[in-house]
């Protein structure tokens, strides 16, 4: 699942910035990739996925899924989007559920 791959790649605070972004980029929507390029991985407060994903869907928008993961910094959410039915899922955002 794309959300699982993305959260594992995201939560690597010791990874050099360029490598971190290059490995994460294929899973990101273009708009989110612009923002993610400026994230400093050293500031990401988790490096372990403890459980998940717990998926939440929107009955009004089947091309939107939230995947929640428990990490060693609490719950984090990966927002997944699909352009159209059958298209690949891409990450539209990753963030702490506490924010």
Label each residue range with its predicted role.
Residues 1, 5, 9, 44-46, ...:
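Residue-level signal for well-ordered alpha-helical segments
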Residues 27, 44, 50, 84-86:
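General N-terminal targeting signals
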């Amino acid at each position: 699942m794309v959300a699982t791959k993305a959260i594992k790649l995201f939560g690597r605070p010791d990874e050099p910035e360029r490598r971190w972004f290059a490995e994460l980029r294929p899973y990101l929507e273009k708009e989110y990739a612009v923002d993610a390029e400026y994230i400093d991985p050293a500031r990401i407060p988790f490096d372990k996925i403890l459980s998940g994903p717990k998926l939440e869907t929107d009955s009004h928008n089947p091309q939107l899924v939230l995947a929640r993961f428990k990490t060693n910094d609490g719950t984090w959410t990966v927002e997944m989007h699909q352009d159209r039915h059958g298209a690949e899922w891409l990450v539209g955002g990753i963030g702490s559920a506490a924010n």
